[in-house]
């Protein structure tokens, strides 16, 4: 009887240690993934476009691409780039 109880307690202790190790590993992977996502976001924010594309918000300092024109469209409260009915030259 003492051996059976000792075996059950020992098995529970082993499962607790394994579970704790698995949880720590999962948390480390989650933190690494989050860090990787933040690095990708930072890299994409530093990449500047030379012009704004279709339905992109435009102003004087953010011009539209050659085949778009900046127009105010109701009910949108800001200017957007719309097609000026021309095609870009290749």
Swiss-Prot record:
| UniProt keyword terms in alphabetical order | Disulfide bond, Ion channel impairing toxin, Knottin, Secreted, Signal, Toxin
- Where is it predominantly found? secreted
Tissue distribution is:
Expressed by the venom gland.
As for what it does, the entry says: Ion channel inhibitor.
Where, by residue number, does the polypeptide cross the bilayer?
Answer: none
Where it sits in the cell: the answer is:
Secreted
Q: Which Pfam families match?
A: Toxin_12
Name the family the entry cites.
Belongs to the neurotoxin 10 (Hwtx-1) family. 13 (Hntx-13) subfamily.
Q: Which residues get removed as pro-piece?
A: 20-50
Q: What are the GO cellular component annotations?
A: extracellular region
The domain section of the record reads:
The presence of a 'disulfide through disulfide knot' structurally defines this protein as a knottin.
Signal peptide span per the entry?
1-19
Q: Which cysteines are joined by disulfide bonds?
A: 51-65, 58-70, 64-81
Name the InterPro entries on file.
Answer: Huwentoxin-1
Q: What is this protein called?
A: U7-theraphotoxin-Hhn1b
Q: Which GO terms describe its molecular function?
A: ion channel inhibitor activity; toxin activity
């Amino acid at each position: 009887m003492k051996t059976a109880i000792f075996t059950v307690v020992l098995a529970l202790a082993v499962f607790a240690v394994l579970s704790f190790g698995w949880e720590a590993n999962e948390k480390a992977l989650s933190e690494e993934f989050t860090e990787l996502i933040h690095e990708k976001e930072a890299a994409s924010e530093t990449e500047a476009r030379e012009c704004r594309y279709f339905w992109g918000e435009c102003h004087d300092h953010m011009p539209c691409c050659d085949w778009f024109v900046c127009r105010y469209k109701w009910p949108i409260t800001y200017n957007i780039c719309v097609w000026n009915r021309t095609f870009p030259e290749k």
